[in-house]
Amino acid sequence: MSIEFVGWLNTYYVGIDQSSYEASKLPGIRNVKGGIHLFTWSPTYPAGLISGVFAMVHEDMKYSIDFDSKSETASLQKLDVLYDENFYPFESTKDWDLLTKFITVQDLQRIFATEGEFFYLDTSTYVNADLVSQDPEFSKPSRDDKLLNFAEFNLRRSWSPSATGPERSKQAIDKSFLFQRLVQSVWNDNPISALAELSISFLSYSILSHYGALEHWKNMLSLLLQSYELAETEPEFYASFLELFKLQLSSLSESDLETSAIFEKGVLLSCLDSLSERKVDGSFGSLVNEAIENLLKTISELLNSHEEQAGLMQKGDLYSAADYEAEVHETGDYVIDVSTEEDPIH
């Protein structure tokens, strides 16, 4: 598959999947594998508004992304003919294939509430949780605004309405009942759609800096990490979830890892502790146990790296302070009072 970038201003960046390029240097790309891709554009990458389109593309098709400078919008088009001899060859990374392996067009159509194979969003696109926001300063979406329709659930009320006593207590701790209810009511009896939604929300945050998607990603993680019975009864599915989570964490940049506050307040770490305790108790099979060990190893490495990076930054601040002190001492052991000089600075 080939894709041409048409009409782009030199100040823009365009991207595919997890890569971004100056628009002026990228007339097009070729050899793109068929499947789910995310095309993005931004005038001030990586800061500022980032727009994009999730797309199911086909290897035997040709496409263009056309930029309209008046409206500052872009659209993805199918083409009959495209001369791509001067386009750059593109190769999807193995990580991208794994990060999107669970996503189908049907999952995207459900979340974006639209037909077709192209699904547009940007950093500011509303999510359905915004409809019930209690923040008086928050502008709620209008009827015409685009909306991401993520699964809605309340982790604090994860039990069946008919559950009482010990059963209710169990379902308050173990979110498996809530997960299965969502599988039936939202994900069309297909638990893999939960992993698709986890993937879409993660990519929307990590690539488009969408913070509504970030909150949903963390809620989905909390739901799945506390679904202990699910880990026992569906080991292959649960190991796939843990492997996906591990890959997502590994693909986050240092700044995204910090901005996401993924381990702040101890919520997810507490979930992981509970999961580890059940592993030690022998609750899970070898497949899930191995996936837990691999995930915990990755988290440990990321946290250690993050602490080292923070330490280096702190050292940098100390060095800057030391350099400043050295400069001061080179001029003498006192501070010059400019008001005593002949030509004071006003």
From Swiss-Prot:
Gene Ontology cellular component list:
cytosol; nucleus; spliceosomal complex; U5 snRNP
Localization annotation: Cytoplasm; Nucleus
Q: Which keywords belong to this entry?
A: Cytoplasm, mRNA processing, mRNA splicing, Nucleus, Phosphoprotein
Q: Which residues carry this modification: Phosphoserine?
A: S160
Q: Name one Pfam family in it.
A: AAR2
> Gene3D superfamilies from the xrefs?
2.60.34.20, Aar2, C-terminal domain-like
Q: Could you give a single Gene Ontology term from the biological process aspect?
A: mRNA cis splicing, via spliceosome
Function per UniProt: Component of the U5 snRNP complex that is required for spliceosome assembly and for pre-mRNA splicing. Involved in splicing pre-mRNA of the A1 cistron and other genes that are important for cell growth.
Q: What family is this protein classified in?
A: Belongs to the AAR2 family.
Quote the protein name from its UniProt record.
A1 cistron-splicing factor aar2
Per the UniProt entry, what species is this protein from, by scientific name?
Schizosaccharomyces pombe (strain 972 / ATCC 24843) (Fission yeast)
Gene expressing this chain: aar2
